[in-house]
Regions:
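Redox-cofactor binding/interface segments in oxidoreductases and associated redox assembly factors
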Residues: 10, 88-89, 198
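Conserved N-proximal alpha/beta basic substrate-recognition cap immediately N-terminal to
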Residues: 5, 16-143
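Flexible, glycine/charged-enriched surface loops at secondary-structure junctions
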Residues: 42, 264-269
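Rossmann-like NAD(P)H-binding beta-loop-alpha module
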Residues: 136-158
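Extended, domain-scale alpha-helical bundle/helix-rich regions
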Residues: 12-14
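Phosphate-binding site of ATP-dependent enzymes
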Residues: 148, 155-158, 166-264
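Extreme N-terminal starter segment of soluble prokaryotic enzymes
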Residues: 3-9
Length: 269
């Protein structure tokens, strides 16, 4: 493989796990193909370091927009990742040691090829913990593993939600009110360790807004509306995406976050 020929390597979960209706990885791959790039796809378990090179046993894949089977595997090849044009880190959490190890390996070649997002920053800015930088712009929020702290938080705000610090996609979100017993919360903490707790905002039933930021520029937004009877708006949990526009306040907040993301070399957010 020639150095920096038009190749995009995608580090992701199993190809079969891609949801063609909701997964932006597919859209990125299709656009790369339209621009003449070959696509190689691999999972973190395929990463290998030998001397100073990082290899991945990768599938050369062609993606399709309108076919029943949205991809075909053309070839299986061990590639030197430093010779690709771009590497897209697209695997979902959990933010575990496998995830972290992959960032260390990719960091070794980050000066030889463009990795999106930067593996050092991905490791040091996990999504929910990164929000600590913007607590003044958020509903009341705490991070804790203490049942007593959660009870105090619940007493103050009546209705709260808790979610795993390193979770994603609206999974394992728990609504808590005065009738939620300690045993249930303790069991949750035992399973998920440190959690993020927030004051519950009733207006979530009308939806939230997902803002897309590329290179520090706000590119668009959607409103995600929960299923009837749900408080979780994530599309992967049954939420529906509709067109929206940002209010002046939302735009002001988004610009603050976008500026910080650009400073920290987070290209896609």
């Amino acid at each position: 493989m020639k150095r920096h020929s038009k190749i995009v390597a995608i580090q992701g979960d199993s190809l079969n796990s891609i949801n063609r209706k909701t997964d932006t990885t597919l859209l990125l791959a299709l656009e790369a193909q339209r621009r003449g790039y070959k696509i190689y796809y691999y999972e973190t378990k395929s990463l290998t370091l030998v001397k100073d090179k990082i290899y991945a046993l990768s599938k050369e894949v062609e993606f399709y927009e309108n076919k029943k089977n949205f991809y075909s595997i053309k070839n299986l090849k061990k590639i030197d990742l430093s010779k690709t044009t771009f590497i897209l880190m697209r695997q979902n959490p959990p933010f575990n040691m496998d995830y972290i190890t992959a960032t260390f390996l990719l960091e070794k070649i980050s000066k030889k090829t463009r990795i999106v997002n930067d593996p050092f920053m991905v490791r040091n800015m996990p999504e929910k913990l990164y929000s600590i930088e913007f607590l003044k712009l958020m509903p009341p929020t705490i991070f804790t593993r203490s049942i007593d702290e959660i009870e105090k938080f619940k007493k103050k705000y009546k209705n709260i939600v808790i979610k795993p610090t390193h979770g994603y996609g609206g999974k394992n979100i728990l609504f808590i009110n005065k009738s939620t017993n300690k045993k249930k919360i303790s069991k949750y903490l035992k399973k998920h360790n440190h959690i993020m707790a927030q004051k519950f905002l009733p207006q979530i039933k009308l939806g939230d807004k997902r803002i897309f930021i590329i290179g520090g520029i706000i590119k668009g937004a959607i409103r995600r509306i929960p299923m009837k009877g749900s408080i979780v708006s994530n599309i992967g949990q049954g939420g529906k995406a509709v067109k929206t526009i940002l209010t002046k306040r939302e735009l002001r907040i988004a610009k603050i976050v976008a500026s910080d993301l650009k400073k920290n070399q987070i290209v896609f957010a």
